[in-house]
Amino acid sequence: MKYPLVPLVNELTFSFLASWLCLPVGLLLFLLIVWLRFLLSQDSEENDSDLCFDWEPWSKGPAEFCQEETLHSPEEERPCW
């Protein structure tokens, strides 16, 4: 039997298949939008002191930055990678 007796997609089944194939994609897109809006609203509620960067360590190498950091604050243990 080369072809099925009843085709899978015809005028009656097209809307049913399209809705069941598009429903998970639409639901995932909706959840992604809600999740991103939630994350953005949490970020704006925090204080803006996190946005102030100290750019001096970026001009140094990682070893110099870690050595200087351990000299200034020996009580804090930070890994040097």
Curated annotation (Swiss-Prot):
Task: Spell out the InterPro entries in the cross-references.
Answer: Adipogenin
Cellular component terms, GO, for this chain's entry? cytoplasm; lipid droplet; membrane; nucleus
Provide the alphabetized UniProt keywords.
Membrane, Nucleus, Transmembrane, Transmembrane helix
Q: How does it sit in the membrane?
A: Single-pass membrane protein
Source species, domain of life: Eukaryota
Compartment annotation: Membrane; Nucleus
Range of residues in the leader sequence: none
Q: Where are the transmembrane segments?
A: 16-36
A single BP term in Gene Ontology: positive regulation of fat cell differentiation
- Looking at the Swiss-Prot or TrEMBL record, what is one Pfam family this protein matches? Adipogenin
What does the UniProt function comment say about this protein? Plays a role in stimulating adipocyte differentiation and development.
Q: Which family does it belong to?
A: Belongs to the adipogenin family.
Q: What is this protein called?
A: Adipogenin
Q: From which organism does this entry originate?
A: Sus scrofa (Pig)
